[in-house]
Amino acid sequence: MSYSDFTRSQIEECVAKSYAAFSTYSQSTLATRNQLLHAIANELEKQRSALVAAAALETNLPEVRLNNELNRTIFQLESYGDACERGYWLEASIDQDASAQPVKPVIKKHMIPMGPVVVYGSSNFPFAYSTAGGDTASALAAGCTVIVKAHPAHPKTSSIAASCIEKAIATCQLQSGIFAHVYGASFQVGEWLVKHPLISAVAFTGSYTGGKQLFDWAAQRAIPVPVFAEMGSVNPVFLLSEKLEQEPTLIAAQLSASYTLGVGQFCTKPGLLIAMECEALNLFCDEMIKLTKQIQPSQLLHAGIEHLYRTKSEQLIAQKGVELIAQSEQQAGVGEGKPLLTRVTASDWLENKLLHQENFGPYTQIIVCKNYAELLLVAQALEGQLTCTLMATVSEAKASQELIRLLEQRCGRLIFNGVPTGVEVCKSMHHGGPFPATTDSRFGAVGADAIKRFIRPLAYQNWPEELLPDYLQDNSLTSIPRYRNGVIE
């Protein structure tokens, strides 16, 4: 099968079909959208063997990991569909007061889908953040049509997933233009899509360079559109001394497993470990060194990532004050990422912005602070993050409110005595954060609230009842939550 880049005319045709289908699909019932998402999940399950086999060949990921990721993807589709039908995200609201003098208008408001959405799949999650992943699921739940640009690192996997979506659309007797799948390894294809005047929003998971480029292209349009890009994070972990004294070995085991999970190719990998000088830190470092040496190198996703990891690691280790204190005792083979553990003083880290950047792969830094004041300086210097973690006793946390306030302003998820890897799919999850972790910190990419990225408010004033959606009509028996005069019914 050919995976050659789409031409400009092919892109035009896809976008035109998507835009035409939006006029109908945007008016579909919530039950219809739920049915579609469940149908996609069902088709993915039917094609499990083919999907996992293709992804294993294209990504070097083990089949156990891929099966677990496919389970997550199926759950996302089903849970987003169920949330869609419950309708809380519509934020239905009615304001009227017949007794008011002078007479006030009747205002009713809800959320409507924005239009065709372009989704750029990620390389490190070929199912959950790719063709049939969370961005596609949440956009379809919102009532938007979707065009997915397949990631060039796993085109066959994406093609199989796309066929599952197309089969589900046919099963539900919906328009084929609801979904389109395009190929393009060149930047040109990505630019054509994001700059097309009929595209209303963009979702992206990947590098800072890629996400920022899409954001800039969208801003250059005559009518700019939102770009929801999840780009990267170093996910700092602050280790307070009392907690470290209690469990240095356990914490080292947790963090060494976390930073090397999936060969360090998780956007939530803990890439900075910050602590104050103390004997417990020495014990922690000794244990981290021992464990890092024992972890074997493994295949990275593709040759491009291996090259970037190797060159970035060499660059970081060459910086002033950076000490390579441990690496895997096994030599890395072709295409493999070797676990690396470095240490640097807070003063050297603060002076060097390069050390603040993400290194995608099994690499982490221990930052040694002289005292609590220096630890606060490190927190102040952090850019936006997907996660920040505090390892502390409760009494330490109570006494560290300034640190906590700093971390709250710099991340989308604040973790207490845990590790950042592992992102639960649930409504309360927020997988996002301030720039440069994402381009819009108000929204997340995981959990049903991800639907909110692709909707906008619309208010109706003095509109005839029979022309309104059922859930905005005065006497509706709808189960959809709604506000009446500011009070939820």
What residues fall within each predicted segment?
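NAD(P)-dependent aldehyde/semialdehyde dehydrogenase
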Residues: 275-386
